[in-house]
Amino acid sequence: MFNIQSSIKKCLPDVLAVLLFVVLAFAYFFPADIEGRILYRHDASAGRGAGQEGIEYLERTGERTRWTNALFCGMPTYQMAPSYHSTNVLAQAANAYHLWLPENVWYVFAYLLGFYILLRAFDFRQQLAALGSIIWAFSTYFLIIIAAGHIWKVWALAYLPPLIAGIVLAFRGKYLWGLLLTAVFTAFEINANHVQMTYDYLFVIFFLILAWLVDAIRKHELARFGKAVAVCAVGAAIGVCINLSNLYHTWQYSQESMRGKSELVKENSENQTNSGLERDYITQWSYGIGETWTLMIPNAKGGASMPLSLNETAMAKANPDYTSIYQQLGQYWGEQPGTSGPVYVGAFVVMLFILGLFIVKGPVKWALLAATILSIMLSWGKNFMGLTDFFIDYVPMYAKFRTVASILVIAEFTIPLLAMLALRELFTVYSSSSCDPAVASGKAERKDYTKGSEGLAGKSPVNRQL
């Protein structure tokens, strides 16, 4: 009985955090939840229209059609609405993970819960983990893509933090949990069917594993490193195998699309790629170099592409005689053709990230810094063509994806993560000085009173101090 009570008491803060996330998710979509309003999402509406023929067929026959005449004089439906018998159980498991919450609500809930799992894998206390989850989930881009209807992208981004949590646990020596989380969330991630987001986050995973490898070499702990890599590889393989049907048909379809090899090649054309999209198309949505300031100043380039007349703050100071002119002026003046809003992480979060570069110890910091810098430079696209051309020509699959600005999702992940590591370090120092006068006077080594530094920061052979 004592053990049961002890377990309940131990899990209670995590349960309360999950309940908090449910409340926050419902609160954010309060009008839609309570008043019955519908969030108009352009891409989702367009997708519904394109798939209407298949929906009617399903309602009429009870079976899914694998072909539609509604697009391009006919095309397979498995890239419009992928559904395979082999992943039916996976879909049910994902619904359980979302607690069967309503649409829109579970998107935000999955954001919050996913990053919470990641921070708990880094051995954060529940309160700090919940705070970090809120900071990450309410980054502007993640909410903008919900409004735009980029739902598969939402799913993919929500599953990536817990996927990385599985890798972190494996490198902490918790192999069973690492295997389980890596397998489950790799399966969820691939089933989300947004290959570009998955591909982008492979850079984060690459830098983390590289940093841990260097650390393992320095400390002569390659055996433990190899075991962790093997666990992650097995988990990833399980997730991939569950989705083999989807992956195979995606690959097969890509060969016949504009992402495949072109049959007609212009001679001496610098715009062509060996196998993939054309350079102009890849870099059409490139973040401006100066536009990078939006990570901490949201309206550095004016905000979203909308008429200035809709900006209530600006109109409060404007001359009403020129309203017709304001209706024709867009408030966004950046380098992209248009945008629904800036990629904003938060000035305070960026400050903590910079502070973390100085006060956080260990290899994870360098991995997060490298991934951040790379994602920012790649997001510049046509404004930094030297690096972009190199990746298009030499990095496998990079030429398959467009809208290079979207790779800033990496920075939106790494900046809050390092910021939270820095915040934990600050709380550690504060708690140590408050609890131990010897530490405050500098006469003793500080201890960690935040219960955040055990695990990766403590006994892990790969990363003893973050």
Q: What do these predicted ranges mean?
A:
Residues 34-47, 250-266:
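Alpha-helical transmembrane signal-anchor/signal-peptide segments
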Residues 1-30, 227-236, 351-354, 364:
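Start-transfer (signal-anchor) and selected internal transmembrane alpha helices
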Residues 24-118, 134-157, 273, 277-345, ...:
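Membrane-interface coil-to-helix junctions
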Residues 1, 201-239, 250, 423-433, ...:
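Perimembrane helix-loop-helix junctions
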Residues 113, 117, 162-169, 205-215, ...:
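Transmembrane alpha-helices and membrane-interface helical segments
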Residues 114-121, 127-216, 228-250:
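Membrane-embedded helix bundles of polyisoprenyl
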Residues 14-22, 224-251, 266-270, 374, ...:
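Hydrophobic alpha-helical membrane-interfacial segments at the cytosolic entry of transmembrane helices
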Residues 10-12, 217-230, 313-327, 352-382, ...:
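Membrane-interface helix-loop-helix junctions at transmembrane boundaries of multi-pass membrane enzymes
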